[in-house]
Amino acid sequence: MDLPDVTAVQNESRQLALASSAAELHGGLCGWLSGGGADSADWLARILADTGQVAPKQGGALDQLRQATVAQMEDRDFAFELLLVEDGAPLAARTDALFDWCRAFLGGFGLAAQQRPALSEEGEEALQDLARLAQASSDDFDAADEDDTALAEIEEFVRVAVLLLHGDCVMGPRFRQRLN
């Protein structure tokens, strides 16, 4: 299942008077789900820690974002994608969006996990690396082609790290529960 268009997510976000970008919303949602948070229609209220937050319109871009993200994270073919910015955006905008995504992921993960979950050694490293990325900024990159390649590699690392954490906190326990 494909993620909705970034612009559609941004537009619906503005209609709900949210100050978060599409990247931040997707990062928070992915963190929430990876930390074991429930897949529910009120996900925005949960990741924003705002019980007064209105749920996204059923079938709207934000609802599609939740549904597609859940499907991608559970896909055995590793079809998970990051929702950042529009294709063709400048390097600085893509870099900022990725680091914003990582910051929001950590927030959502912390809200869902509430306390330190039992992670594999690789999961611990992935979480620490995501925390380091969350502290970075686009100032660490310039417009060189090497930086464009480096950003693509970092995006791929983030994608794999998220799936690893989701595996540690959600898929692993679910599998162990089936065995018992």
UniProtKB/Swiss-Prot annotation:
InterPro entries tied to this protein: YgfB-like, YgfB-like_sf
Domain of life: Bacteria
GO cellular component: cytosol
Xref: Gene3D superfamilies: YgfB uncharacterised protein family UPF0149, PF03695
Record NCBIfam families: PRK04758.1
HAMAP family: UPF0149
Family: Belongs to the UPF0149 family.
Protein name: UPF0149 protein XOO1028
Organism of provenance: Xanthomonas oryzae pv. oryzae (strain MAFF 311018)
